[in-house]
Amino acid sequence: MVTMRDLLECGVHFGHQTRRWNPKMKKFIFGERKGIYIIDLQKTIRYFRYTYNIVRDAAAEGKSVLFVGTKKQAIDAIKEYAEKCGMPYVNHRWLGGMMTNFGTIRQSIRKLEVIETMEEDGSINLLTKKEALMLRRKKEKLIATLGGIRNMKSLPDMIFVVDTVKEKIAVQEANRLKIPVVAPIDTNCDPDVVDYPIPGNDDAIRSVQLFCQEMAEAINEGKSLLEQDGGEQAAGEEVSQDEKDAVVAEAMSEEDFGEDEE
């Protein structure tokens, strides 16, 4: 479990400039130095350990935790530690409705499965070169946006978010669906939208890595208490020819499909 030394070495105590703050964070601020707010690490470690236990206990009950973080400093850590604890993640772009319109998201994941099946059974080679190219482009885009949640068959029981300001849509969806939110909260954040806040720096790479690492450790500790591996997955649904045809037609209709989105 995290120590005070860990927090100091990773710069968890450094907040934002004093002109960029949320007054609701006042109770978590120790002071100010050179125009930067300093977060009270005594409170951080208390909230950190409490939240660690909450996440561990959730995992021990077989609950799922969705990792969310799409900014540059979080992309790698979110993927790395979500995979280390076998949890779903979003680290590319949060699609509006990813949770509130989950049925549609599952349909898109199904399209990814159809394309991969076509590659495996060779049926993609029966298409024209252009059709095959468009399908592969569609596959790459689906993997980028949905690859981390492709095995998430239902809504998560909890979400862990890095930067609740940037990921406000994800947080809003979780709040609407009564899905508990776990998150580090920097001095510019609103703690009221987070069920299990941990006051701390959500910008520095080492700080972000520490938060992700601790959440993964809590989950793995909880999973070990389940006394079951949980790694067995149900067999995928068989892909029909109609599904293949529909995905090809959709890919061919997306003329601007290869363009990057910001």
Swiss-Prot record:
InterPro entries: Ribosomal_uS2 (IPR001865), Ribosomal_uS2_bac/mit/plastid (IPR005706), Ribosomal_uS2_CS (IPR018130), Ribosomal_uS2_flav_dom_sf (IPR023591). Residues 223-262 are annotated as: Disordered. Residues 252-262 have a biased composition (Acidic residues). PROSITE patterns: RIBOSOMAL_S2_1 (PS00962), RIBOSOMAL_S2_2 (PS00963). Residues 227-238 have a biased composition (Low complexity). GO terms for cellular component: cytosolic small ribosomal subunit. Gene3D superfamilies: Glucose-6-phosphate isomerase like protein, domain 1, Helix hairpin bin. It holds the Pfam family Ribosomal_S2. Signal peptide: none annotated. Disulfide bonds: none annotated. GO terms for molecular function: structural constituent of ribosome. GO terms for biological process: translation. Keywords: Ribonucleoprotein, Ribosomal protein. Belongs to the universal ribosomal protein uS2 family. This is Small ribosomal subunit protein uS2.
